[in-house]
């Protein structure tokens, strides 16, 4: 049994398989998930697990060089946005309109659905390299 890092076997496998610039999404419970993208549904009830809880575990186990968020989060969900900025201060940030964000999710290797129920609590993580 694994002791540290991501314990969810599906998430651990996706992270291990990522190549440079591949993307994964951590999403609130309302983001539409394209049929063509692997869905890892962690939502057990409204608010659980939270977006920030899942984000923290993933960023501790993933090399990230860039993140993409919807512009709307900066004004409509400042609390989550400030936490994203703090936790990912080393990454480059890309801001797109929410509709474009949804289009970009079609290229992700997986979308991790949380129980988060606040607006625009979604992020695309772009894999970096560990060397």
From Swiss-Prot:
The active site is at 20 (proton donor). Substrate binds at residues 28, 98, 120-122. Its EC number is 5.4.99.62. It catalyses: beta-D-ribopyranose = beta-D-ribofuranose. It is found in: Cytoplasm. Keywords: Carbohydrate metabolism, Cytoplasm, Isomerase. GO terms for molecular function: D-ribose pyranase activity; intramolecular lyase activity; monosaccharide binding. Its main location: cytoplasm. Catalyzes the interconversion of beta-pyran and beta-furan forms of D-ribose. Belongs to the RbsD / FucU family. RbsD subfamily. Homodecamer. This is D-ribose pyranase. It comes from Bacillus cytotoxicus (strain DSM 22905 / CIP 110041 / 391-98 / NVH 391-98). The gene is rbsD.
